[in-house]
Amino acid sequence: MTHQLRYVPLAAAMAFAALLAGCQKNAPAAAVEGADKINAYITCFNGVEQPIHESYQQYIGWMQDPEAGPTGKESGIHAPGTVLSHHVDECGTPMTAALAQTPAKPELDPVAKTYQERFTTLNERIGEAVRYYDREDYLRDDGKGMKALHAPLMQAYQAFFEAGEAMNTALEHNEDTRRQAQIDAIEKEEGRSASWYHLKIIGEGKQLVQVLDNDTPDLAAAQSQLARYQGLLEEAQKAKIGQGDAMWGHMERSADKLARESGRLVERIRTKTPLNKSEQMLLESGSMPPGGTRQAVLASYNDLIDMSNRMSH
């Protein structure tokens, strides 16, 4: 099994959206009622998903063949990375309490329960491995311990990754449904107000990222969604939405940045322009991603979500 480190930004939007649902008078009652439950699921997911992917990469990075496992003769041996204790705690009691909350969410609760269980199992396996490697027992047991730990640890990683994909899909679907219901309610009561544009920009931006975050993006679909997103931004600008509001201005600039980076990537796809050597090196360095890349689009989306979260406080 090999598993590539991936970005996990899309669920981040839901922390803002669920919070907004809880504080807006015109939010659908179901959205308000279930906000605490969803927030607990999101908090757990956002807290452990990325660290676990990084943990996995750290663990297999020094092995010649992760499928076969360690031989005990490698150099640069590392224990798997750990998850910060407060993030571990977020997937414990708060998650259990959320699972017990009513009304139940049949499409989401079983997925969340599996995610919690598999994270707990994996975290225990990681803890066992970390103690073994930190003691450097492999220097005295001819690597027998690392070989014994490897298969159960890799199985736990794989089970968690599968649960993570299911959790992300379930959270995304729940949020898409909730957001659209709220957008419809706001438009009915207020028209296309700042709140309406706020949620709409987040939703259309997310759709744009999803179209582009693919090894082989559909060019026509990407161009269509980019035009839709740009049209929404232009409509808000012409309506003078958020005029004079500094925080809206920050979010607006983040939204424009997402449009710009997405446009660059669409153009790269259209012209079939590969990354040049300097862009490839920049991408591999893990620093600021070069323009016209999936990573740059995702980073721009994360910035938009960050600005949206700040507006909600």
List where the protein language model places each region.
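N-terminal Sec/ER secretory leader and immediately downstream segment
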Residues: 33-147, 290
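Secondary-structure edge/capping motif, primarily at the C-terminal ends of alpha-helices
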Residues: 55-70, 98-105, 126-140, 174, ...
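Amphipathic alpha-helical segments and their boundaries
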Residues: 28-47, 104, 180-194, 293
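A cross-kingdom marker for long, charged
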Residues: 224-313
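Bacterial signal peptide processing site
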Residues: 24-26
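Bacterial N-terminal signal peptides that target proteins for export
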Residues: 2-11
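Extended amphipathic alpha-helical interaction segments
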Residues: 146-256
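C-terminal motif of bacterial Sec signal peptides marking the signal peptidase cleavage site
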Residues: 19-22
